[in-house]
Amino acid sequence: MTETTGPQTIGSDAIVVGSGVIGSAVAYELARGGRDVLVLDKGAGAGFGSTSASSAVIRFLYSTYDTIATSWEAKFMWEQWAEHLGLDPAEVPLARFHRTGALHLDVPIVPLEPSLERLAAVGVPFTYLGPEEIAARFPHVDVGAYWPNKPITDDAFYADAMGSLGAIYTPDAGYMDDPRLAADNLAEAARRRGARTVYRAEVVAADRVGGVWRLGLADGRSAEAPVVVNAAGPWSGGFNRLAGVGEEFTIGVRPLRQEVHQVTQPAGYGTDEAPGPAVFDIDLGTYMRPGPAGAWVVGGTEPECDPFEWLESPDGVDAHVTRERYDAQVTRAARRLPELRVPNQPSGVVGVYDVADDWTPIYDRTDADGFYVAMGTSGNQFKNAPIAGRFLAAIVSAVEEGHDHDADPVTYVGEHTGLKIDLGAFSRKRPVNESTTRTVLG
């Protein structure tokens, strides 16, 4: 169904609700597969929601084989971004991948040997570094062990280290330098494949009539298609409820307010040409990565000692960074990098995670015919956006052709790695994965 059915109704083969980096990737892959795609987003453009607040880290250490394989396959897409999109960088400004490497510091809640085994099974290059090796190669990094996490207002936070840490070093990790632009690149690539994007288009109603979904918009228009993909980010749970979808889900989602802060790297940590590594530090409750021109991006790994800011709705979230979050996260970063300076004036961005119960995404069909979800991304799926689009395209194609994805989950074979990824790992009906860190690190 490609025709417009009336001046107030927009028809298509598939509607993607949400134009963040995930929704834009889904739209691109559906359009690339030959579908007439309509993208609806309540914002002013692609990536204007929580995507714009992403740290845009590209890393590979997760708690299951399939999630590691997913991130490793996606890495090649980011590295070959222009080719992946079919866009000419001389014609269209493109986000860029920066290879920095990453240190994943030891912590008791992430058993070391299974992590090493999973990385090896996938084929991710890595080295395990002991404390002395870290100190020799990355002298700015303190190797003290401080677990468990403590609030910075507790004197125990400043106590001497109880031991020393090693780390898994993955040299191919890095970051994308502009997450909003990356989403816009995907949206542009989708449009060049025939997709239409409609912004400032808030969905306020959703009903299935016969074999077609009809979505009502706040401005009085409507959109119709046999297929709908919910990629609404922190609004995804609400959109499911609006559509009467989700009763069968064993995995719930909730919006969580988060802050990411920016300071300046310690002198000598790295340069744009030879950047120092990102540091993932559950031991202290933080993650950090370099940025262009000496920037240092600092986020949190959800320490249990800090309050979680769960939201009833992402609408109206306070978009200003707070002194409390800034002090907590940047002080933890400075404990790990003793030469890091902590400016008095907070600087950073606010975003909202769409948190799944086990911090693992849901890429799946639903019990409602024609309704699919790319949700529960939990603040850790920017890195997987290009392949998430391919996952949804594969699931939609299989299910619309009559395949029972619940009984026989689709297997995705990586174009770049040849890895087989069981998409049942991202099922809405999966058991809660008790082995995840229950943090943004997955």
Give the residues covered by each predicted segment:
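C-terminal lid/capping helical subdomain adjacent to the catalytic/cofactor pocket in oxidative enzymes
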Residues: E3-Q8, Y128, D367-G442
